[in-house]
Amino acid sequence: TNALSMTDTIDLTSISSPISYKKSIPGQTQTIACPVRLPGYVRGIFFSRDSRPVDFEWPNNTNRLLPWVFNDLKELTDTRYPGIPSNATPSTLGDALLLELTNGEYLFAKAVAGRNSLSWLQVNDNGSVTLYVSTLGKDYLKPEVPLLLIRQGKDIYSTIRQAYQALMKNTEAADLKSRTAKEYFEAFRYLGWCTWEHYHDDINESKVINDMKTIEASGIPIRYVLIDDGHLAHKNRQLTGFIPDKQRFPSGWKKIMSYKKENKIKWIGLWYSLSGYWMGLSPENGFPQVVRQALYPHAGSLLPGTDSTRIRSFYRYYISTLKEQGFDFLKVDNQAFTLPLYMGGHESIRQATDCNRSLEAEIHRQNMGLMNCMAQNVINTDHTSYSNSTRVSIDYKKYDEDMAKSHLFQSYTNTLLLGQTVWPDHDMFHSCDTVCGTLMARSKAISGGPVYLSDAPGDFIKENIFPLIDEQGKLFRPEAPAVPMPESILTNPLWSGKAYRVAAPSGNGAMTLICYNLNASPRHQQVQATIKKEDYSLRNSFEKMSATPEERVLLYNWESQKAEEL
């Protein structure tokens, strides 16, 4: 990066404001680099994607924002760093840092967006940190831009929560509401089914209809179906229109919509990309002329823009077209790649942000549901003004135990951050997965987010499904999403040699807790976990809840169906 090096240090040993600003940036500057002074720390987590040579890098975080645990930051650039199984090495460019300090307190720092600027953190070989801020395009930075969201405190949960509360108040850096202040789309309160992990993109009209019939006859009260990738009309991975591929879906969506029933499959959702398809919109498209006027060519693709009004008009057409075809909600994927599609042009960050803002506004205005996916860069995460569900992890894969363990570690840790503003989506799973099925079912149960199967409908295993739902398919959900217990937050449970404990506050003043052995090493095939009476007091730390001191605490083991007093 051709960045202007700034001499003044961003001093995190002395915090005066929850969002720090850089002032007096010289004119005609596109990118600045600021050294960061860290307080003394014991250990921490750096949140960044993995660095895969064949893949795009930051800011295309996709679903790959991962928690890289360290005792010293320079470990992350060491080739011997153990990492996270099923993932590549840590990217040194990231979005957040969580530290346990030598004084016993905690420090949380997160990159932020401005009107047309974006910051990110870089870990250097010697363990030092540099903060960059850029327009990522041809424009120059304004004289004053936001740098970092920062919070320090004695309790790890409240430190992160208070940081996000400050972010929600800053309308320049974010357009956010807390998870508890937003509506949760009704369909996501029920069990669903998705085409992706069963078919990937090999879907067509007859397969979907046959599976809907099989689902209805299965005795499993699945209440929504999500049709994932494989239906889109496109050329070279660029969208040509919002009508499905005519060879695969000759009837459009009419036949499929006719299978909706109030007491069976009530809702149907559809997958699309934020920018149309993986590589944007095709110049050879069938959009109405008024929609074409809202698009412009950039770097081989058509994109919505350049002003906010045109971008909003494109998303108004996008959402209304799919709503008119009968869909109740959308899974909008590939969100993190929208910014790279705009990069190198004018007002790249502002336009990419407008895409997220417009999507949110139109989904809300037209009363549709929204699942956010591959939406883990700052622009995506910090502009969920209405939607209340975002994927927090890399895809689940059938029969892959290492990937399942990594998936759980990432999901629970990322929920500490993303769970402040949305319910976490732990991805779909196969109930028939003989390796990971029960593992996945339990994590979905305490995530509080959407729960959707992806088995072939004839392969459902009821033992991994019925404990999650009532007779109408309504999910039993906790009062807040599950997060790691304090001793499990700043450790890598795949190498720690210890148990990994997560918990969520649940109904009637209860707390639901899972003790995992996620260790990848055969040396730790068995670990011991302890549950103490004092653990119950943490129920009020996960959310800002009123204290409920209890003289007696009862522990109920769901597996054995037995209870004992702690």
Which residues fall in each region the model found?
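Flexible loop/turn segments at secondary-structure boundaries
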Residues: Y199-I203, L232-N236, S275-L281, F337-L341, ...
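Carbohydrate-binding surface patches
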Residues: K444-S447, Y452, T491-A547
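Glycan-recognition surfaces
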Residues: W278-K323, R357-K462, V483-E487, T491
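N-terminal accessory beta-strand-rich subdomains and adjacent acidic, glycine-rich linkers
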Residues: T1-K169
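Short helix/strand-capping turn motifs
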Residues: L191, P467, P481-A482, E487-W495
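Aromatic-lined carbohydrate-binding/catalytic grooves of carbohydrate-active enzymes
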Residues: E186-I349
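Solvent-exposed beta-strand/loop surfaces of large extracellular or lumenal domains
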Residues: E550-L566
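Alpha-helical scaffolding within the catalytic cores
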Residues: N170-A181, W253, S313-Y318
